[in-house]
Structure formats: C-alpha cells, structure tokens
Amino acid sequence: PPPPPPPPPPPPPPSPPPPPPPTTPRWYRRRQRQMCIRDRLKEASESQEFRNIFSGSSILPNSNPYAMCYGGHQFGNWAGQLGDGRAINLAEVEHSGQQWALQLKGAGETPYSRTADGLAVLRSSIREYLCSEAMFHLGVPTTRALSLMLSGDQVLRDVMYDGNPAHEKGAIVCRVAPSFIRFGNFEILAAQEDKATLTALVDHTIKHHYSHLGKPSKGTYLKFFKEVAVRSMDMVIHWQRVGFVHGVMNTDNMSILGLTIDYGPYGWLEDYDRGWTPNTTDRTNKRYRYGTQPQIVLWNLLQLANALFPLIEEAALLQDILKEYQQEVDIAYLEMMKSKLGLFEKDKNDKILITELENSLELSETDMTIFFRQLGNFKSDGSQDGLELVSKAFYNEKEIVKEIEAKWKTWFLKYAERLQKELKNDTERSESMNTVNPKYVLRNYMAQL
C-alpha cells in the first residue's frame, strides 16, 4: 500500500500584538506636493485620523499592515533570515496610474525586530528624510520620504557605541516607493528551497513592476534579471556621479527596482577619496568604500542570480548577464565621467585623462563637489589658470606643493587640448556640465547636526 501522507506542517507562530501607539504624535515635516498628499488628500492630511495613520496609531480601513521577511548577505557573508525590524508596510495606493507603497519606519516592534524595539529617533529620521529628497532632486533613483512625525516618546540609544546610552526624541518616517521588495526577499526563499513561493514572488514582481517583459517563463525570468542588473547599474553610476556613499550595501539593502533604499550610515564625498566609507564598522576592510560600489553591485547581482537559478536552471545564461554588466558598467562610468568634464565627442585617450584626474584629486584634500562645479567655468582656449579657477576646492592650499602644482598644470594643458575637439562652445559645455555636477549636496556635517 502507498505510504501514508506526511502530517500537515505545524501552524505558524502567532504574530506579536501590534506595537503600542505613539504617545503624542505630531507632524514634524510633510510634503504636501508629494504624489500621495495633494488635491483632496491635502485637506485630509490636517485631520487627526490622517495623523493617526501616518504615526502608526491606527490603520486604514480594510487594510492589513505587514512586515516583510527576507534574508541577505551582510559584508560578504550569508546572514540568514532578517526582515523588516522596524518597518511596517501600511498599504499600496494608486495615483496618476502609478502604484505606490507606503511604509512606516520607526513605528514599533515587528516579528523581525529580534531584540530591538523597532523604534527610530529624530536624528536618524531627519537624515533619511533629507537624503532621500536630496537624491531625488539630484536625479538619483531613490525611495522618497512622504512625512516625518514626532512620536512624543523618548527612545534609548547608544549614539557613540561606548556603553553610555541616552534618551532621544522618537520619530516616524513614511517612506514611499513603487515597491520595497529587495534582493533578500528572493534569497531567503531560495535558501529555504521554497521554489513555489519563490516563483510566486518573481511572477508577482514581474506582473506589477516589469509587466512589459511578458508572461512568466524562463525567458522572461532572464529578461527580468537583466533589467534588474541594468537598473542597479544606473543607480550606482548616479551614486558615483554625485559622490554618494551608501555605507552598507548588503543584499538586503538592494532594491529589486534599482532604487536607493535604506539610508543608514551614508555619507557624501567631501574631499575626493576613492577609499572613503562613512560606516565606522567598515573602516578596517572598507568593503563598501566609494571606489568599489559598482563592483559591489555586481557581487550582489551574483547573489540574486544564485537565488533565481532554481527558476532558470542554466548557470551560463545568468553568467552571461553578469559579464555584460561588467562590460557595460565600465562604459557607463566612462561616459558619466566624460559628462562631468563636458566631453561629448569620442577620443581614445579619454580614459587616460580621467584616470590622471582621479589620481590628481587625491594628491591633496580636494572637495569633489566644488571642483567639478568650478571646472564648468574653464575656458577651452586655455587662456586662464585652471589651478586658480578650482582653488576654492582645495581645503588647504599649502598642500599644493611644487610637485602637485606641476601635475595639475600638466593635466589642465591636456584638458584644454581635449576641449578643442569638442563641437560645443564654452557656454553650452558649461550648461551641460552643470546638469550633472551638483552645486550643492547634503554635506555630512549638516546631516549630523
């Protein structure tokens, strides 16, 4: 006789009760022009009900807020199951034909909080609010911030990690994005060998966010992976353009839509240093330093490829896409740097010119943002002193000793010669450069006040 069927799996453990509501929630900042608070919702945002929902005090009717389970590779090692430890997905809304997910960060404990309290403080919440909006307006793919609320509660945090915790003001940010699905959502299912749920998640993601790729099939899954790679490459090239350093590029912090997500220990390059990272816990190995970010994206894509392999079952096809990324990211980086220099015509020596510039920028403390913005005023006829033009970018002009000065003058001579091959005049070139070289970035000291 056939063996008896296996016993049914045990029921899942009960979810913990919802976190207690904030004591006295009130608005700290809200974007009335944002995609979700406008027109008829603008008036609603003044209501007590609206404040209750966006502080986590109450939920929308007929909604079922949830926290997501995901895994991830952290600093190059598999960390197992992780999940939304202090993020709660409120709902998804549609506005002007676009789907938006609303997520609260800091509203309290979730099933994945482990030993943490699920809360956030005003200091880190302001950092996330400001940076996500700054990135959006600099043209960088990113999640956005809809609102920032004070909870009215005090939250205990050890800011300096020195064993002296202190109470800070609690706060809650509402994040907005088409989706908050991460690489880690796929990784955990592959690790659990749950092919059915993995397939369902991939199909859901394609249906709602990559529907142009067609109906689910092995070919569609490959096209999906390739487009995720392209979007991720576009994101990281923009990071390099504006000097943004994420700081914690674990696979659980990689958006499946190619958006910048999770603004934690981020920072902006001030003096140009390809080895810099803002993450103090990464200061020894500097895995996530500025100069390696494009390669870290490739490594993370490899982990996503491993997670998707059960649906494709041909490693060579996935490897081909990863090889394409390596080739294309080098080209994309070169084109991005050329745009920062106002170079639009092809020249076989451009890569050498850019490498020499990057090396010169590291000879002394040179402010990246100021340097490239000032460079837009350079005259192609070589009639001005390039070093004097960018002198505001040097933190200490006394560091510009004769050897460094000579290297800079040599580079500016080559740059002036190269500009002679361009079709745009100085005014047109300057205008083009100013569209990619920001005048202002969110300076680290401002974000840490």
What do these predicted ranges mean?
Residues A315-N437, N444:
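Helix-loop elements that line ligand-binding/catalytic pockets
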Residues P2-R33, I37:
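Single conserved hydrophobic/aromatic residue that forms the stacking wall/gate
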Residues Q32-R33, S55-L213, N300, R443:
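Conserved ATP-binding subdomain of kinase catalytic cores across diverse folds
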Residues P1, R26-R29, R38-I59, L102, ...:
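TRNA-binding/sensing appendages of the translation machinery
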Residues S124-S125, V155-D158, D162-H246, L257-I352:
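ATP-dependent phospho-/nucleotidyl transfer catalytic cores
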